From Swiss-Prot:
Catalyzes the hydroxylation of n-alkanes and fatty acids in the presence of a NADH-rubredoxin reductase and rubredoxin. Pfam families: FA_desaturase. Signal peptide: none annotated. Fe cation 1 binds at residues 138, 142, 168, 172. It comes from Ectopseudomonas oleovorans (Pseudomonas oleovorans). It catalyses: octane + 2 reduced [rubredoxin] + O2 + 2 H(+) = 2 oxidized [rubredoxin] + octan-1-ol + H2O. Belongs to the fatty acid desaturase type 1 family. AlkB subfamily. The gene is alkB. Induction: Induced by AlkS and n-alkanes. This is Alkane 1-monooxygenase. One of its GO terms (biological process) is lipid metabolic process. Keywords: Cell inner membrane, Cell membrane, Iron, Membrane, Metal-binding, Monooxygenase, Oxidoreductase, Plasmid, Transmembrane, Transmembrane helix. GO terms for molecular function: alkane 1-monooxygenase activity; metal ion binding. Pathway: Hydrocarbon metabolism; alkane degradation.
């Protein structure tokens, strides 16, 4: 143990220049409350949609202005960096911030005169930041400590997506970039078509995985040890209390913010592995996932409000590695912008495809066999990109089935 400490202490001096900027990820959930304050002070209801304006407008512009950060912590300092408590505390503090955003917004809707348009704008704004509660849960849920894992469940309950805890860790990380993964999108598949199989597919896979785990322990899937039911119960209690306190408007407000929160995860899943495919080996199994099976983004500003989620390639290579330690690698497939801009592009399928499809084909070296392609778009792509895949349509058929 002493020798291990000597190794850590001898690591070269490293200064994380973004150390205190990560506070932006913790403060981001406060944005709807800032919008409420501005709307109240100015009388301009447009501020209820502040998060929409910042997320889909300001952040893509800031990403374009400030560009990318390719700096990595030296590998030898990563163990020491992982142990620095400050970074973990920021994720803990983010959990009550999400609850504050939900409760304050619900209180305002339930007690103040607002038009339905204003209520809708605030619900969508809250949906964006609470969709990113999934990102907070993602960071905490990959940790081994019981406290962290419970914090993940608690924050996932805010947006009613408790099954993410099981689905992402045990399902997506196992099946990513294969046809078995409902959370991997296919080239040519619009985000709207993707959502129809991704949202129910994620729940079905998560429930099946948890049922198998409990069965091996001789327990019913309806046991309180079910890690999907635990956050679901918190959600039901939380929403029931908000309904009792703030009235029937919650019957509209809460489902809208929840649905748009789910849409944020769908958007992330859609862009993170679009078209990418792990190849089958001779034994019929898929190759081990590698960093190049995820789309990466080093855009500075959006990474600072997302706990480095956009360094997704290293995350899949090292799932338990904390956000401050995630690295970039040369030659990784890269998104043209950060997640906010990519989410916006994804909602306009023609725009997204015009930018991303050539990138996917380039990633595959021009071989369409190495790409997950939506079955309805295969002939279109064969005509558009041609190349060596024309005689091997069986691979793409399997991909899209």
């Amino acid at each position: 143990m002493l020798e291990k400490h000597r190794v850590l202490d001898s690591a070269p001096e490293y200064v994380d220049k973004k150390k205190y900027l990560w506070i932006l990820s913790t403060l981001w959930p406060a944005t709807p409350m800032i919008g409420i304050w501005l709307a109240n002070e100015t009388g301009w209801g447009i501020f209820y949609g502040l998060v929409l304006l910042v997320w889909y407008g300001a952040l893509p512009l800031l990403d374009a202005m400030f560009g990318e950060d390719f700096n990595n912590p030296p590998e030898e300092v990563v163990p020491k960096l992982e142990k620095e408590r400050y970074y973990r505390v920021l994720t803990y503090l983010t959990v009550p911030m999400h609850y504050a955003a939900l409760i304050v917004s619900a209180w305002w809707v339930g007690t103040q005169p607002m038009s339905w348009l204003e209520i809708g704008a605030l619900a969508l704004s809250l949906g964006i930041v609470n969709g990113l509660a999934l990102n907070t849960g993602h960071e905490l849920g990959h940790k081994k400590e019981t406290f962290d894992r419970w914090m993940a469940k608690i924050v996932l309950a805010v947006v009613g997506y408790g099954h993410f805890f099981i689905e992402h860790n045990k399902g997506h990380h196992r099946d990513v970039a294969t046809p078995m993964d409902p959370a991997t999108s296919r080239m040519g598949e619009s985000i709207y078509k993707f959502s129809i199989r991704e949202i129910p597919g994620a729940f079905i896979r998560a429930w099946g995985l948890e049922e198998q785990r409990l069965s091996r322990r001789g327990q019913s899937v309806w046991s309180f040890d079910n890690e999907i039911l635990q956050p679901m119960i918190i959600t039901v209690i939380l929403y029931a209390v908000l309904l009792a306190l703030f009235g029937p408007k919650m019957l509209v407000f809460l489902p809208i913010q929840m649905a748009f929160g789910w849409w944020q995860l769908t958007s992330a899943n859609y862009i993170e592995h679009y078209g990418l495919l792990r190849q089958k080996m001779e034994d019929g199994r898929y190759e081990h996932q590698k960093p190049h099976h995820s789309w990466n983004s080093n855009h500075i500003v959006s990474n600072l409000v997302l706990f480095h989620l956009q360094r997704h390639s290293d995350h899949h290579a090292h799932p338990t590695r904390s956000y401050q330690s995630l690295r970039d690698f040369p030659g990784l497939p890269a998104l043209p912008t950060g997640y906010p801009g990519a989410f916006l592009m994804a909602m306009i399928p023609q725009w997204f495809r015009s930018v991303m499809d050539p990138k996917v084909v380039d990633w595959a070296g021009g071989d369409l066999n190495k790409i997950q392609i939506d079955d309805s778009m295969r002939e279109t792509y064969l005509k558009k990109f041609g190349t060596s895949s024309a005689g091997h349509s069986s691979s793409t058929s399997a991909v899209a089935s």
